[in-house]
Amino acid sequence: MAFLDNPTIILAHIRQSHVTSDDTGMCEMVLIDHDVDLEKIHPPSMPGDSGSEIQGSNGETQGYVYAQSVDITSSWDFGIRRRSNTAQRLERLRKERQNQIKCKNIQWKERNSKQSAQELKSLFEKKSLKEKPPISGKQSILSVRLEQCPLQLNNPFNEYSKFDGKGHVGTTATKKIDVYLPLHSSQDRLLPMTVVTMASARVQDLIGLICWQYTSEGREPKLNDNVSAYCLHIAEDDGEVDTDFPPLDSNEPIHKFGFSTLALVEKYSSPGLTSKESLFVRINAAHGFSLIQVDNTKVTMKEILLKAVKRRKGSQKVSGPQYRLEKQSEPNVAVDLDSTLESQSAWEFCLVRENSSRADGVFEEDSQIDIATVQDMLSSHHYKSFKVSMIHRLRFTTDVQLGISGDKVEIDPVTNQKASTKFWIKQKPISIDSDLLCACDLAEEKSPSHAIFKLTYLSNHDYKHLYFESDAATVNEIVLKVNYILESRASTARADYFAQKQRKLNRRTSFSFQKEKKSGQQ
């Protein structure tokens, strides 16, 4: 029998009733202000008592134990709630339904129609198990590859096959290049050989890869086993080797160059090879001349004419007026284009437009060009820098570095740490394309240590002039180098500049003639 006014019984009943179902722990907070068990152990002391604290034999405060139900026992799985029988049955029914979906029930039916013995025999036909004789005369792909293997093993350029990028397209950086082979016969040299190389390969590795692919395809003639005997030159789309530029540096990576068309040329100056003299044909035109390089004297005059016209028109399409070739010593006599250079017995020709003739004084016969002059003309396209002073109209001269090559002329200011640029205008770098250059003339030569030259170029449909000064030797070298470049290119801007200059001269001459005529009449 329990009394409801007994707080001890009420507290124990609440704790034992909620300990298995209350996850919040609020049952432990019931009657925390009036803990009956703690008050039993430590009764309140009367005021004035000095020994109010009750200590145990060991000097520690005595603990207390809450009342616990006898029915509740602590174990390892005390906090785990077991599944009910209903949940287990539902899980078993779900698995049975899934297994029934996977199974297919077929209802057995008796056969009504009777089939003949021949039809039953055709359902399960007996197969012949006789061994078939092997087919002879047909070669497998493996046998063919094994027969071709010795040819690849004998390739002296096998070490460069690792740079072949045909199997790495899309996964690794590769570069596709069309390579012309001038050492081929006249028919095969017109068609390029496509090579796919790894972008990380050097120029020397690309040369070895070209030689490896050339040998693997069985091309003729055979190549030299030494890769150093060959070099790569820049080539036009039709296979013509551009001799104005030096060959690519063999130690540079191939991804540094953006050319998609190259030519494999043999180094005649390599050890073990005989030297071969370069042959040049001079083609005179209205505003200069061109030097056309040929391999031998067996070349036809038609090929020389095509090269001369292409050199004259540059990147434009070879169309418009037609031209013919004439010997320099035989005016108005056209050269047979089907004949060879050897049969002409001449190395200097004139490029004349059809239905026209050479005017007197247009083509002046120059003296025979020596080999030193030819070398200077060819080396003029190589890059070279000069330190000169740029002359300005309203301010002091500026020290600049003048870089000249076959493509462009660059003017870069030389920075001087001592000179203060706070109160002066800083010179900006200038880049002039060679096709926009018009003239380079010697303006003044006072002494061997001081000379001035003028550089004229086209900028925004207007001709601008730049003046530079340096010692006489440097100025003469610059003027000669720029004029060699201008004579070999024959640009449109240069032709228009000379035409405008001639019109001004004619206008000035006619004006002075009319003035003299009026003064004579008076």
From Swiss-Prot:
Phosphatidylinositol 3,4,5-trisphosphate (PI(3,4,5)P3) promotes MTOR activation by relieving MAPKAP1/SIN1-mediated inhibition of MTOR that takes place in absence of PI(3,4,5)P3. A 1,2-diacyl-sn-glycero-3-phospho-(1D-myo-inositol-3,4,5-trisphosphate) binds at R393, K428, K464. The keyword Protein biosynthesis does not apply. Residues 382-487 form the SIN1-type PH domain. GO terms for cellular component: cilium; cytoplasm; cytosol; early endosome; early endosome membrane; endoplasmic reticulum; endoplasmic reticulum membrane; Golgi apparatus. The modification N-acetylalanine is found at A2. Residues 468-522 are annotated as: Interaction with ATF2. It is found in: Cell membrane; Endoplasmic reticulum membrane; Early endosome membrane; Late endosome membrane. Residues 139-267 form the CRIM domain. The modification Phosphoserine is found at S128, S186, S315, S356, S510. Ubiquitously expressed, with highest levels in heart and skeletal muscle. Residues 2-267 are annotated as: Interaction with NBN. It holds the Pfam family CRIM. It is a peripheral membrane protein. Keywords: Acetylation, Cell membrane, Cytoplasm, Endoplasmic reticulum, Endosome, Golgi apparatus, Lysosome, Membrane, Mitochondrion, Mitochondrion outer membrane, Nucleus, Phosphoprotein, Stress response. Component of the mechanistic target of rapamycin complex 2 (mTORC2), consisting in two heterotretramers composed of MTOR, MLST8, RICTOR and MAPKAP1/SIN1. The mTORC2 core complex associates with PRR5/PROTOR1 and/or PRR5L/PROTOR2. Contrary to mTORC1, mTORC2 does not bind to and is not sensitive to FKBP12-rapamycin. Interacts with MAP3K2. Interacts with ATF2. Interacts with MAPK8. Interacts with GTP-bound HRAS and KRAS; inhibiting their activity. Interacts with IFNAR2. Component of the mechanistic target of rapamycin complex 2 (mTORC2), which transduces signals from growth factors to pathways involved in proliferation, cytoskeletal organization, lipogenesis and anabolic output. In response to growth factors, mTORC2 phosphorylates and activates AGC protein kinase family members, including AKT (AKT1, AKT2 and AKT3), PKC (PRKCA, PRKCB and PRKCE) and SGK1. In contrast to mTORC1, mTORC2 is nutrient-insensitive. This is Target of rapamycin complex 2 subunit MAPKAP1. It comes from Homo sapiens (Human). The gene is MAPKAP1.
